[in-house]
Amino acid sequence: MTIPVPKPAHPAAPDTNTDGLPNPKVVVPVEADEEEDDDDEEGKEDADGAVPAASHFSTHALDGTKKKKKKKKKPKKKKTGEAGAGGQSEPPRVPVSKLFPNGNYPSGEESAYLGENSYRTTSSEKRELERLAAQEDPESAENYNSIRRAAEVHRQVRRYVQQTVKPGMSMTEIAEMVEDGTRALVEVDGLQRGIGFPTGVSLNHCAAHYTPNAGDTIVLSADDVLKVDFGVQIGGRIVDSAFTMTFNNKYDKLLEAVRAATNTGIREAGIDARLSDIGASIQETMESYEVEVDGKVHKVKSIRNLTGHNILPYHIHGGKSVPIVANSDESAIMEEGDHFAVETFGSTGRGYVMDDGECSHYAKNPDVNKPIRLARAKTLLNTINKHFDTLPFCKRYLDRLGESRYYAALDNLVNLGIVQAYPPLSDIQGCMTAQYEHTIILRPTCKEVVSRGDDY
């Protein structure tokens, strides 16, 4: 989930595996085997009537008897929702805790720090402090098992999505495919485990913050560019990762540009790194690409008023922004222990987004405490506090909880500033936008791209 750059008081514009390290292991479904064929197939001769040559050298052949031919095992066809032996089902419904019964989940891509922080990689003191902190408090920020579990859920859900989503599916089908898989694999448990924020399925010129509301009729087409942005949280530790899907090769260079820009941001990230320098490097990579569409060449532009962000427990936007263009602020830096969502957006349009269309994304503002006079707004806020607290939510999630006739109450909470609305963000009509995003942890000893997979 992205964060738009705050609008200036007087805006000039309209309103507003590069380190060579292995990817984490991912559990792959293993097909169960069929039982051996019936006895009447045993000892069957070859087509020309001869016994298979290998049997002439068997112990059975020495006494003149014919060796029974070893039967080929036929793969058992897996039924919908059935797990392979030791693997994930299709659709994914096997909790990752069942696939990793020892409770140790794969780490992400780990990279050594460079420059003056390179000592951290080999520092026995840093390693010991990291180890002790994780042992002393399983819920501490230094214990990475919860977020690695969330990352494994993300990888397994998105693998199925990438294999299954096809033109002709509705946006609601796609969003619910992601969410149903996430709930099952994470073993949803109130605020302790569940969805990190509404599933973004933004299309084409819409870059972010679109998820279908009830009654949405939009259907995916073969020429669409689909951004899938979803989160998984365990104990408030959120994995935020996104990818882009297309169904022809027309926009391959756009996706390549954005993927490369995100990896540049990850490469440049580190303890004491200036956020402005990271933004400049991202922009340089992004805008070195061009896309030819129907004979017209488009320069890929970074969407300058969208950024990445740090992540705090139960807060998807922690207060620090990772720009994707150069800026003059040299004071903001990354620090040891930070969790960041490094995300970039590229566009064939003007590289600037504005609010566009019906809102679906919302989040409670923890810093606002105002009296509420509307009784229905009070009961709605109670629901929000109980089920989401400061985690983002959408109207479909309220519908799922049985809330009804709440639109006026929700508007009241937004007008009071108690709830923040996050409407869809779009570039100009007719252009295409793409997104890639990973969650990284700046550990004391190394940088870990916790959401890295074998796909991106």
Curated annotation (Swiss-Prot):
A divalent metal cation 1 binds at D229, D240, E437. Binds 2 divalent metal cations per subunit. Has a high-affinity and a low affinity metal-binding site. The true nature of the physiological cofactor is under debate. The enzyme is active with cobalt, zinc, manganese or divalent iron ions. Most likely, methionine aminopeptidases function as mononuclear Fe(2+)-metalloproteases under physiological conditions, and the catalytically relevant metal-binding site has been assigned to the histidine-containing high-affinity site. It comes from the Eukaryota. Its cofactor is Co(2+); Zn(2+); Mn(2+); Fe(2+). Keywords: Aminopeptidase, Cytoplasm, Hydrolase, Metal-binding, Protease. A divalent metal cation 2 binds at D240, H309, E343, E437. Residues 1-127 are annotated as: Disordered. InterPro entries: Creatinase/aminopeptidase-like, Met_Aminopeptidase_Type2, Pept_M24, Pept_M24_MAP, Pept_M24A_MAP2, WH-like_DNA-bd_sf, WH_DNA-bd_sf. It is an enzyme of class 3 (hydrolase). Its EC number is 3.4.11.18. Cotranslationally removes the N-terminal methionine from nascent proteins. The N-terminal methionine is often cleaved when the second residue in the primary sequence is small and uncharged (Met-Ala-, Cys, Gly, Pro, Ser, Thr, or Val). Belongs to the peptidase M24A family. Methionine aminopeptidase eukaryotic type 2 subfamily. This is Methionine aminopeptidase 2. It comes from Puccinia graminis f. sp. tritici (strain CRL 75-36-700-3 / race SCCL).
